[in-house]
Amino acid sequence: DYISIRKSFFQKDHKNNNLDIESARTRKFQEDWDTYAIIDPKLKGKKVIKDFPLAELVDYIDWGPFFHTWELKGKYPDILKNEKYGEQAKLLLDDANAMLSEVIKNNELTADAVFGIYQATSKDENVTVEGHKFNFPRQLVDKGSDKINYSLADFISTNQDWIGMFAVTAGKGIESIISRYEKEHDDYKIIMIKAIADRLAEAFAEKLHQMIRVDFWGYSSEKNLEIKNLIKEEYDGIRPAPGLSLIHI
């Protein structure tokens, strides 16, 4: 039962030399919020984006995880030169790009998003956003007294700050595509369209995050930031994600 599981969990944590929460807080990330310059967003509140052009997402696609769908391990584009399955990887990528072109040409998938930028304050591991409290657990592993035990709440001011959040989908319309392939008994294309929609959703998240940083919030210019550097997250700000689901908004 859950009580025994909970006891076992905390006993295991104790054996792993975890800190108690008060001790971990003494090692939190410290920022001087009295001198830190907080930039107010240009757009405050919620905004909905409907039918974002898929063609504008193509350059933002990170193809690396695409190959994991097919259980091919390796980094993109190096995987295309893999001695064991490089040719297979190339064929998969060619098929993916061909299907992606058809999807864009025929408007078979729709990309929608909603995002918001709201006032926020933090205390310990909690962030309060317009009266709603969000908890961001702190790292408890004892990494040494000179190491930081982070909580995402550490990066929100204890005074007045701002926080952004968003959800995207690039999967609206996928049901009809899958249904068509099911009638054709084409399992390969079913897996392929799901993998493409997954990559488009991630690309949309990358693109939207950039739009928020540069346009809607406006705290970053990124005039010379190339796509490859963007995918490596070489920009100001972070985008912690709870997961990637193709949901309808």
Language-model features: where?
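Charged, low-complexity helical/coil segments in non-catalytic cytosolic or luminal regions
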Residues: A201-V214
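Active-site loops and adjacent core secondary-structure elements that bind or stabilize anionic groups
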Residues: D1-I191, A195, F216
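Conserved small/polar residues in nucleotide/adenosyl-binding loops
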Residues: I247-I249
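Generic long, charged, amphipathic alpha-helical segments
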Residues: K223-E233
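Aromatic/basic-lined ligand-recognition segments
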Residues: K232-L244
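Short acidic alpha-helical/loop segments enriched in Asp/Glu that coordinate divalent cations
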Residues: M211-K223
